[in-house]
Amino acid sequence: MGFTFFQDENGRDFFPVGLQAHNSSTGTELIRKAIQAVKAYGGNCLEAPVYWYRLEPEKDVYEMELVKDLIDETRAVGLKLIILWFGMSKNGHPNYVPEYVKMNPGTYRLVIGPDGGTLPALSPHCEATLQRDKKAFQKLMEFLKAYDEKERTVLAVQIENE
């Protein structure tokens, strides 16, 4: 066996070749289009986003149906999956956080700019935000272990994509 970061479900080295779905690709139809592109390209892996606000639409309410569908769709055509976790920040913007976070800047603090005003970005130094993102991410990882541990369709999870 050579050196590799990835192994398939049988422990064999696996070199992922594929495409990354657009960061706004969500839902079964868009994922199917991305899968078709990977297959047309001759790839073996899809990178696709999972958004915090879709995973936790309300505080402490976690919905894994979209994650399950994403795994099922890639597994059905023999592809591997790398999940892109879009949590508290993407390119510095909180586009993918739940509404309860966006609507509560007193708890989930914004970045303070050089002039003392707030910027439209969640502060990476805010413990409340970090704990909520961490909890949602932990729920995702627990689901992945429970749902995909045997088949190992998911190769990796990229944390805080971009």
Task: Label every model-predicted segment.
Residues 67, 88-148:
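Active-site-adjacent "subsite" loops/lids of carbohydrate-active enzymes
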Residues 42, 49-51, 123, 148-161:
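Conserved alpha/beta enzyme-core scaffolds, especially Rossmann-like or related mixed alpha/beta domains
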Residues 14-18, 45, 78-82, 152-158:
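Structural preference for beta-strand elements that scaffold enzyme active sites
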Residues 30-107:
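Aromatic-lined substrate-binding rim segments of carbohydrate-active enzymes
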Residues 18-23, 48-50, 83-87, 159-161:
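A cross-domain feature marking catalytic cores of carbohydrate-active enzymes
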Residues 24-31, 60-64, 126, 130-137:
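Solvent-exposed, acidic/flexible segments
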Residues 11, 46, 74, 140, ...:
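Conserved, mostly hydrophobic/aromatic
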Residues 1-44:
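N-terminal carbohydrate-binding accessory modules
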